[in-house]
């Protein structure tokens, strides 16, 4: 038994003891959790009780963005040792599956992902996890930054899928946490400038403080107009759709240059219209993103090198004993909040 933040059912959280796995296989590690980020999917399970086909039918521990310390290693683990500071990739695929063998383990149908029913998450003091999906953090990278690797990895995956070339002009629709991570990954990946569009000025103020980022408030100016003015009527080389909003998705052909690339990162709640002819008329290349695969090392190196600074995106750090309040704050969706983190007792 261990104390954990448990989603009992839709709209009901509790901090209580719950049975958790403690047995170590030869390829596992036991990790003492130190910092956990609150993700939009965690909040959605809290408020709606489900995401698509994944329904909370029994109590589930929340949390999947985490960093911590190795407490024990399995007998076959060689790249980690007790005391190592680590972050964890929360999806555990079947390594013998066809998807995994193709290197796209993120779309393995049998993947078990933290805090996705019926799999428990990591908002509990200790977790057992495969060493293969546990990554050492450099000494100067904090636990808070380590817990940001998971959402940043989505941005890195998007940047890689985009096939950015040095000097490209990027555009990001949506200034939520993933939109911001994607914009920073696109800059690190070679974009000379990235335009970020959103309705919420406080969010734009946060991401706009970064060098190389320009913001567009869509309440004040159409994104297509702003990008046309900035690119001599040409359009962005790469457009990342991170909002999941139907109007933004429908407008995509008007934002990209002829022969450009559109990367679909945001996930609409319901099916949305898509301008296929508009895409065809410009021969736009369309890429999609689902989580990430084989990018954690890259994400950690970008943070460790100082190339990407995610610390300004951490809006609040709240103690584990107040984690229900942390989730209630996340539900509020305060205009200036980007990432709320929960700090576990050492």
From Swiss-Prot:
Its keywords, alphabetically, are: Metal-binding, NAD, Oxidoreductase, Zinc
Q: Name one GO molecular function term.
A: D-xylulose reductase activity
Q: What reaction gets catalysed by this protein?
A: xylitol + NAD(+) = D-xylulose + NADH + H(+)
Question: Where, by residue number, does Zn(2+) bind?
Answer: 39, 64, 150
Could you say which protein family the record assigns here?
Answer: Belongs to the zinc-containing alcohol dehydrogenase family.
What cofactors does this protein use?
A: Zn(2+)
Record text on cofactor binding: Binds 1 zinc ion per subunit.
Q: What name has this protein been given in UniProt?
A: Putative D-xylulose reductase
**EC number(s) for this protein?**
1.1.1.9
Supply the Pfam families for this chain: ADH_N (PF08240), ADH_zinc_N (PF00107)
Query: Which InterPro entries does UniProt cross-reference here?
Result: ADH-like_C, ADH-like_N, ADH_Zn_CS, GroES-like_sf, NAD(P)-bd_dom_sf, PKS_ER, SDH-like
């Amino acid at each position: 038994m261990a104390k954990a933040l448990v989603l009992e059912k839709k709209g009901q959280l509790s901090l209580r003891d719950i049975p958790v796995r403690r047995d170590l296989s030869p390829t596992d590690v036991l990790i003492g959790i130190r910092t956990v980020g609150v993700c939009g999917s965690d909040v959605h399970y809290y408020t709606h009780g489900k995401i698509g086909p994944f329904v909370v039918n029994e109590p589930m521990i929340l949390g999947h963005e985490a960093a911590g310390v190795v407490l024990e290693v399995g007998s076959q683990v060689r790249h980690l040792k007790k005391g190592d500071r680590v972050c964890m990739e929360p999806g555990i695929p079947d390594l013998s599956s066809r998807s995994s063998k193709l290197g796209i383990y993120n779309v393995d149908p049998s993947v078990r992902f933290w805090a996705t029913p019926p799999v428990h998450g990591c908002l509990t003091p200790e977790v057992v996890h495969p060493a293969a999906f546990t990554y050492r953090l450099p000494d100067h990278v904090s636990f808070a930054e380590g817990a940001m690797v998971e959402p940043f990895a989505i941005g890195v995956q998007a940047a890689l899928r985009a096939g950015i070339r040095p000097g490209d002009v990027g555009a990001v629709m949506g200034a939520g946490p993933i939109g911001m991570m994607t914009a920073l990954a696109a800059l690190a990946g070679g974009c000379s400038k990235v335009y970020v569009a959103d309705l919420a000025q406080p969010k734009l103020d946060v991401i706009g403080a970064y060098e190389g980022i320009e913001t567009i408030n869509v309440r004040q100016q159409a994104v297509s107009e702003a990008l046309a003015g900035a690119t001599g009527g040409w359009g962005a080389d790469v457009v990342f759709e991170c909002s999941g909003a139907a109007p933004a998705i429908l407008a995509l052909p008007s934002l990209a240059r002829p022969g450009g690339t559109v990367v679909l990162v945001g996930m609409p709640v319901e099916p949305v219209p898509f301008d296929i002819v508009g895409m065809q008329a410009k021969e736009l290349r369309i890429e999609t993103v689902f989580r990430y695969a084989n990018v954690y090392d890259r994400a950690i190196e970008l943070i460790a090198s100082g190339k990407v600074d995610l610390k300004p995106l951490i809006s609040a750090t709240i103690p584990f004993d107040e984690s229900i309040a942390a989730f209630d704050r996340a539900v509020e969706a305060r205009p200036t909040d980007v990432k709320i983190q929960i700090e576990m007792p050492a």
